[in-house]
């Protein structure tokens, strides 16, 4: 296309010698040679420098990207490590909490057993004390009943029973008779009640 334009301009130049658009042939050749030299110098000196600078820059960028990727992998590995440590810590905390709850339940159960044993011992002591007190009361009541019976027998008979053994025998027989007599469970209500 440029060639066609130059040829067209040359033909016109032949007709019009003083055309502004068509330069003289010598100038055109010198201009083309100068342009070729400039392009040659560019490819000989400047282009290799540009390629070298471009390659260095690309290498720096790739190195930066590699470092960034390596740092990202390291950060990801650290993140995974932290996550696993966190999960481990959580499971450890759950295990400790379960152990504490189990120990708490065991302590409560031991305390409950201990309290039940103490309550049973207190009941046994109270029952034993009640039995002893009842026996004491029964013995005291029997003595008093014996004395009252003796006094009553003395009044009824009109004379004092002279023998101690005989007195005791009489009291014991009276008390035995009381023990054998049927005891009412409840007092019957009278007609006025």
Curated annotation (Swiss-Prot):
Function: F(1)F(0) ATP synthase produces ATP from ADP in the presence of a proton or sodium gradient. F-type ATPases consist of two structural domains, F(1) containing the extramembraneous catalytic core and F(0) containing the membrane proton channel, linked together by a central stalk and a peripheral stalk. During catalysis, ATP synthesis in the catalytic domain of F(1) is coupled via a rotary mechanism of the central stalk subunits to proton translocation.
Ranges annotated as spanning the membrane: 24-44
Protein name per UniProt: ATP synthase subunit b
Keyword terms of this UniProt record: ATP synthesis, Cell membrane, CF(0), Hydrogen ion transport, Ion transport, Membrane, Transmembrane, Transmembrane helix, Transport
Subcellular location: Cell membrane
Keyword Cell membrane appears in the UniProt entry: yes
InterPro entries: ATP_synth_B-like_membr_sf, ATP_synth_b/b'su_bac/chlpt, ATP_synth_F0_bsu_bac, ATP_synthase_B_chain
């Amino acid at each position: 296309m440029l060639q066609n334009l130059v040829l067209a301009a040359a033909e016109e130049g032949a007709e019009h010698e003083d055309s502004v658009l068509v330069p003289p042939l010598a100038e055109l050749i010198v201009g083309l040679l100068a342009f070729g030299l400039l392009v040659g110098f560019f490819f000989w000196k400047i282009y290799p420098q540009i390629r070298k600078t471009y390659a260095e820059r690309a290498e720096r960028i790739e190195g930066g990207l590699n470092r960034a990727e390596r740092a990202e992998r390291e950060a990801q590995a650290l993140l995974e490590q932290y996550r696993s440590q966190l999960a481990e810590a959580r499971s450890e905390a759950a295990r400790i909490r379960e152990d504490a709850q189990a120990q708490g339940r065991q302590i409560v159960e031991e305390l409950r057993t201990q309290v039940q044993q103490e309550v049973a011992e207190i009941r046994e002591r109270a029952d034993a004390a009640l039995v002893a007190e009842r026996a004491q009361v029964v013995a005291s009541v029997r003595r008093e009943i014996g004395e009252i019976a003796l006094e009553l027998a003395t009044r009824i008979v009109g004379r004092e029973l002279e023998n101690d053994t005989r007195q005791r025998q009489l009291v014991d027989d009276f008390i035995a008779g009381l023990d054998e007599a049927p005891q009412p469970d409840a007092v019957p209500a009278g007609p006025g009640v």
